[in-house]
């Protein structure tokens, strides 16, 4: 069906910044283990957000990122090194089918809207997890390295401090 989002005035907006996995994964969430840490788990927690009077959630990165893109023996928990800006993080979905993450993310957004809660996405558009010239090729580097990234003399320019900088000037 048609999804319409709430329009709260800025003066009346109460934003709850959250990490989808972190907000729903802990045992204190009371969620079934199968949906804890997922978009579906967040749907189940909407009554709690409504009870708090929340009018908007700011979701920390929910686009696809590499959880192993971190120092040895660590994980990339926060997701600030995107692989693809247009694909929901698959590990946050309880539905592991090919369209599961997309379907579950869409259902979560619709459920939040239906309950009067706006959705704000925290995004990083200055770099990707592909790193520098020696980093992995996931997406943009393979499509058109010179088009997507700032390149000088064939090498990535690192204005972001993350190994590469997206060419947002074109």
Language-model segments: residues:
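Substrate-binding/active-site clefts of carbohydrate-active enzymes
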Residues: 21-41, 47-170
């Amino acid at each position: 069906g048609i999804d319409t989002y709430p329009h709260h005035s800025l003066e009346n907006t109460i934003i709850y910044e959250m990490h989808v996995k972190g907000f729903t994964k802990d045992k204190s969430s009371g969620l079934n283990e199968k949906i804890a840490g997922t978009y579906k788990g967040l749907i189940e927690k909407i009554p709690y957000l409504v009870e708090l009077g929340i009018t908007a959630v700011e979701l920390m990165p929910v686009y696809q990122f590499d959880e192993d893109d971190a120092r040895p023996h660590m994980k990339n928990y926060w997701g600030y090194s995107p692989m693809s800006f247009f694909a929901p993080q698959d590990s946050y979905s309880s539905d592991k089918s090919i369209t599961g993450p997309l379907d579950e993310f869409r259902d979560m957004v619709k459920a939040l809207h239906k309950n009067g809660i706006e959705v704000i996405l925290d995004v990083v558009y200055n770099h990707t997890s592909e790193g520098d010239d020696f980093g992995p090729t996931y997406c943009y580097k393979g499509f058109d390295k010179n088009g997507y990234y700032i390149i000088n003399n064939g090498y990535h320019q690192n204005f972001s401090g993350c190994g590469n900088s997206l060419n947002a000037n074109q």
